[in-house]
């Protein structure tokens, strides 16, 4: 099925590309999320008329994401208190939701889906480097310090 991409899609293309994808992928993912439209003659003409507007919108979203990434990088570190045993092993773990809530409380709005934990959830006290994927092209790093609760 031929579709016109309205957004950058990983491993597929960027704004304005006409690509051939499986019908189910287009019908169930790309079209409902507003990332593509079927490549009919009418849609091609409509897209060409709105191309500049869509590119400006995409640039605005990218600029906002870069601003948020800069704010995350400026935080340097966030401290999270959790119950822990004598050897620094946590009772439970600290996951993406806990980290997102702590960063949001520190003043930068972050969704839990933007938190990337390459080594899995945090299960020990100490310093941990956490990555954030704010946009498909924009990444940020933050140091999360896990301290035992008193």
Curated annotation (Swiss-Prot):
The keyword Protease does not apply. GO terms for molecular function: rRNA binding; structural constituent of ribosome. It holds the Pfam family Ribosomal_L9_C. It comes from the Bacteria. The keyword Aminoacyl-tRNA synthetase does not apply. GO terms for biological process: translation. Gene3D superfamilies: Ribosomal protein L9, C-terminal domain, Ribosomal protein L9, N-terminal domain. PROSITE patterns: RIBOSOMAL_L9 (PS00651). Keywords: Ribonucleoprotein, Ribosomal protein, RNA-binding, rRNA-binding. Binds to the 23S rRNA. Belongs to the bacterial ribosomal protein bL9 family. PANTHER family: 50S RIBOSOMAL PROTEIN L9 (PTHR21368). This is Large ribosomal subunit protein bL9. It comes from Yersinia enterocolitica serotype O:8 / biotype 1B (strain NCTC 13174 / 8081). The gene is rplI.
């Amino acid at each position: 099925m031929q579709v016109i991409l309205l957004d950058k899609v990983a491993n597929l293309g960027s704004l304005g590309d006409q690509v051939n994808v499986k019908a189910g992928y287009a019908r169930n993912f790309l079209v409902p999320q507003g990332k593509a439209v079927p490549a009919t003659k009418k849609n091609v003409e409509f897209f060409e008329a709105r191309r500049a507007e869509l590119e400006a919108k995409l640039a605005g979203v990218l600029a906002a994401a870069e601003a948020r990434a800069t704010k995350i990088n400026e935080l340097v570190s966030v401290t999270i208190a959790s119950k822990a045993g004598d050897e620094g092993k946590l009772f439970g773990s600290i996951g993406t939701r806990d980290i997102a809530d702590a960063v949001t409380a520190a003043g930068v709005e972050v969704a839990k889906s933007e938190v990337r934990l390459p080594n899995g959830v945090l299960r020990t006290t100490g310093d941990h480097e956490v990555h954030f994927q704010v946009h498909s092209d924009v990444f940020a790093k933050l140091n999360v310090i896990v301290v035992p609760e008193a």
